[in-house]
Each structure stands twice: as structure tokens, then as C-alpha cells.
Curated annotation (Swiss-Prot):
Stored Gene3D superfamilies: 3.30.160.20, 3.30.230.10
Name the UniProt record assigns to this protein: Small ribosomal subunit protein uS5
Modified residues (N-acetylalanine): A2
This protein's encoding gene: RPS2
Residue ranges of every copy of the S5 DRBM domain listed in the record: 102-165
Length: 293
């Protein structure tokens, strides 16, 4: 009996610390597949070290121009990519800059069904939030036949959707920025989420779903207001993420200063991209010879 109790409540078991971090409110972090699996193996491999598996050991071979520039250290930070609005198509770019500080959390896993001629086809939809608690946050949604596949896909999509978060002050500009710079509103479906600056020390006054995203974004103090069907967790999370991503959409007076326009990395490192593209294409065309008898 002692072994069974240790397996069920240990760090790697289905009843480990992962459940304690997700709360137990209706439709929330703790009402996912863990309750339906009942220890039959669906909840395994959810720890930090279990995700990724052998894929993390392989060397990253970038397939996009942006990926080649990042791997060759031509782009020094993620902010350079955001400055020129370059689309990020490889999650390894995010891992390259933020890999050590990124934390992810499964917000919800819900079954969805599709009616076919053969009957109902059930798949699982995973909502995953990811952030470094210091100005970067992302949200990923993935649907798959298996829970583990859905979570892995949602983590990759969350990394690709990471946006910078602009922080500001409620009153005097003393200390580090701690709240949203202005009132921002995000919407998804019928859900409308409004973020309002708050004094230092207030904390995040919101429901559990926006609170988790705001904490991952690095916002310490914030008032929130929500309207619509907030019981729909997916729309609630997407509306909050939409509001957070709009913090850089407003040109406030402190950003009115003239800036010097510089070349895009694609223009600045054109010669380097031509060389690396030639080298990569040669490696791909030189296939190993196959012995025939």
C-alpha cells in the first residue's frame, strides 16, 4: 500500500504537484484529462523533463532565413525580430533566446467530437499558456487524437505566438514598470476583457485564467473587467491574450520621439544568407551512395 500511495502522490505520479498548481475551479486547470485517466497512463510524461524527448538532443538545422540568422548569431535578441515584424516560423528561435526562462502551463484539456458516417470521432483540444514572467507571453491551442500530441503541438504553437508585453506605471515613474501602460481591451467571441492599470502593490485582480496569463507576462498589478460567456475558457484566454498583445498597439506620447530607421536583417545580411543557403543546398543534394548488387 505504501508503494501505491507513493506512486499516486509522488512528483511524477498523476496526483503529484502538477495538480496543485492548476486549481480546481469549474472548467479550469485541474479539470483536464487527469480526472478521466484515473492513473491508466494518460497523465504520464507531463513533467518538465519528459516533454520533447529525443527531439531536444538533435542539433537544430534551421530551414528559414530568420532561423539561419539567429543560429549564426547575426540577430542578437528577440526584440530585433519584433522591431521589424518578422514572422517566426520555427519554435527553436524562441528556445534559442528564451529557452531557459520559459515556463508553460496547461490551462485546459477538453474533448471535442465530430459526427461522421461511422459515428462520433473524439479528439482532445489542449490550451497551453507559455511565458518567461518578464515581458513575453504566448497562447497555443491544438487539437489531436491523443492528449500528449495535443499538448506538444499546443506548446509549439504557443512559442510561435509569443508576443512582447509593454509594461508601464500607474502614477509616478518610480522603480520598475509594474502594470499595463494604459487601458486595453481584447475580444474573442462574446468575451470582452479589459485591462486597467493599478497602483503598485494591488496585485492582479481577475479570474484565474487571465491572472495566469498576466503573471506569465510579467505584470504585477492590474485590474480586469470581463463581459460575455467567460465560462468558455478558450475564448476567455484568447480575449486576455488579445488584450495583452495590444499593449504595443498604442503610440503614447513617450514614444513620439523620432527614431532612426535601419535596414531589415534580411537586407543587412543578404550576402551571408546567400552563402549559407548555398552550403545547405549542397548538403541536401549530396545524398549518400547506395551500394547495389
Amino acid at each position: 500500500m505504501a508503494d501505491d500511495a507513493g506512486a499516486a502522490g509522488g512528483p511524477g505520479g498523476p496526483g503529484g504537484p502538477g495538480m496543485g498548481n492548476r486549481g480546481g475551479f469549474r472548467g479550469g486547470f485541474g479539470s483536464g484529462i487527469r480526472g478521466r485517466g484515473r492513473g491508466r497512463g494518460r497523465g504520464r510524461g507531463r513533467g518538465r523533463g519528459a516533454r520533447g524527448g529525443k527531439a531536444e538532443d538533435k542539433e537544430w538545422m534551421p530551414v528559414t532565413k530568420l532561423g539561419r540568422l539567429v543560429k549564426d548569431m547575426k540577430i542578437k535578441s528577440l526584440e530585433e525580430i519584433y522591431l521589424f515584424s518578422l514572422p517566426i516560423k520555427e519554435s527553436e528561435i524562441i528556445d534559442f533566446f528564451l529557452g531557459a526562462s520559459l515556463k508553460d502551463e496547461v490551462l485546459k484539456i477538453m474533448p471535442v467530437q465530430k459526427q461522421t458516417r461511422a459515428g462520433q470521432r473524439t479528439r482532445f483540444k489542449a490550451f497551453v499558456a507559455i511565458g518567461d514572467y518578464n515581458g513575453h507571453v504566448g497562447l497555443g491551442v491544438k487539437c489531436s487524437k491523443e492528449v500528449a500530441t495535443a499538448i506538444r503541438g499546443a506548446i509549439i504553437l504557443a512559442k510561435l505566438s509569443i508576443v512582447p508585453v509593454r509594461r508601464g506605471y500607474w502614477g509616478n515613474k518610480i522603480g520598475k514598470p509594474h502594470t499595463v501602460p494604459c487601458k486595453v481591451t481584447g475580444r474573442c467571441g462574446s468575451v470582452l476583457v479589459r485591462l486597467i492599470p493599478a497602483p503598485r502593490g494591488t496585485g492582479i485582480v481577475s479570474a484565474p485564467v487571465p491572472k495566469k496569463l498576466l503573471m506569465m507576462a510579467g505584470i504585477d498589478d492590474c485590474y480586469t473587467s470581463a463581459r460575455g460567456c467567460t465560462a468558455t475558457l478558450g475564448n476567455f484566454a484568447k480575449a486576455t491574450f488579445d488584450a495583452i498583445s495590444k499593449t504595443y498597439s498604442y503610440l503614447t506620447p513617450d514614444l513620439w520621439k523620432e527614431t532612426v530607421f535601419t535596414k531589415s536583417p534580411y537586407q543587412e545580411f543578404t550576402d551571408h544568407l546567400v552563402k549559407t543557403h548555398t552550403r545547405v543546398s549542397v548538403q541536401r543534394t549530396q545524398a549518400p551512395a547506395v551500394a547495389t548488387t
